[in-house]
Design a protein with these regions (language model features):
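Glycine-centered loop/turn motifs
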Residues: 61-64, 141-157, 263-268, 304
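Glycine-rich, small/acidic residue-mixed loop/short-helix segments
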Residues: 220-227, 242-327
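Short, conserved active-site entrance elements at the starts or edges of catalytic domains
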Residues: 191-192, 197-223
Length: 327
């Protein structure tokens, strides 16, 4: 599918969200799994504000995560958003981009809103950890928490802090860089699978084709990583998401795990004592081990978790943030 007024296409790989590290350790990597979408028109901000789980009005010089839900409160897409002049920029996985944009367009009606694929001519780079030192070595500014900075033709986005997981990521502050495709940084960038390992290590959910409509935001800790605000007014699924929040507890939460063997696909089941208790959100494989983000019944974390009823045990790791009551 083509974005409006553009010649670029998006990948529709249904198995996206499972990654295998093939390159050497790298702190600056090329991330080709994202599509960049520019949204313009006098009604663009108002329209998007009424569609997503986070506030789009008042973005200013910040970058925010947001989700797009079904009327039943299930996540269809996740994204990062920031302003570029009067345009709203959306960073979404290529694999969900076509269905996501198609669905958004259904609700534009008479509003002045246009979607344009802005991926041509740019490359997304990820700083997978220790961003202060990495960016300083590159003579680039470090964005403040949640901020966007621009430097010599680059757009640098702050990203959530990740924890250290030996062999996968060094942890610490992270960043995303929108760079011209011919920029010198691009040639030296490493394996993009390390970016997705850092996303798992940050406890940061991305919705992939196999996990569309599986999770309410709280089941993947989305409100704990800045993806939901509860005072912005209506959006699709808002009543369900708010109801879960005001109950005070949710029976499902996201966790990080390490397990021997090949990386599972997103949406693959998680088992406890032979019973299905959750689903894989994302997975990265390296050297015979897989780092996974998964959502499961909270009570199941007290027992043995596996990827198959008789499979290897998942070693549950700490999250880089606290699980709090939803109330």
């Amino acid at each position: 599918m083509l974005c409006q007024n553009s010649t670029c296409t998006m990948d529709t790989n249904e198995d996206a969200g499972r990654f295998v590290v093939t390159g050497t350790d790298a702190h600056l990597v090329r991330v080709d799994d994202y599509a960049l979408v520019r949204v313009t028109g006098k009604d663009a901000v108002t329209f998007l504000h009424g569609q997503f789980t986070n506030a789009i009005q008042g973005l200013g010089d910040t970058v925010r995560s947001a989700g797009y839900c079904t009327p039943k409160g299930r996540l269809l897409a996740t994204m990062r958003l920031w302003m570029d002049g009067d345009a709203v920029m959306m960073l979404v996985p290529k694999a969900i981009g076509p269905a996501f944009i198609k669905r958004l367009r259904m609700y534009v009606l008479r509003a002045d809103v246009k979607f344009e694929c802005a991926t041509d001519g740019v490359v997304m780079l990820g700083v997978t950890g220790n961003a202060e030192a990495v960016l300083a070595d590159l003579h680039m500014p470090v964005p403040a928490e949640g901020a966007v900075v621009r430097h010599e033709g680059l757009t640098i986005l702050d990203a959530e802090v990740a924890q250290t997981i030996a062999g996968f990521t060094t942890g610490g502050r992270r960043a995303l860089i929108v760079a011209p495709a011919d920029h010198a940084l691009v040639a030296d960038a490493g394996d993009g699978a390390y970016w997705w390992a850092s996303e798992v290590a940050a406890g940061k959910v991305t919705i992939w084709p196999r996990t569309r409509e599986l999770f309410v935001p709280q089941a993947v800790n989305f409100e704990l990583t800045g993806g939901v605000v509860f005072n912005k007014g209506c959006y699709p699924g808002q009543e369900v998401v708010s109801r879960v929040q005001h109950i005070g507890e949710t029976s499902r939460r996201a966790s990080i795990g390490l397990v021997a063997g090949d990386a599972p696909l997103p949406g693959a089941p998680i088992f406890s004592d032979g019973a299905e208790v959750g689903f894989v959100v994302e997975a990265v494989q390296k050297d015979g081990k897989s780092l996974i983000l998964f959502s499961s019944l909270r009570a199941a974390l007290l027992g043995k978790l596996t990827l198959t009823p008789e499979g290897a045990e998942v070693d549950v790791l700490p999250l880089p943030y606290k699980i709090t009551s939803t109330k």
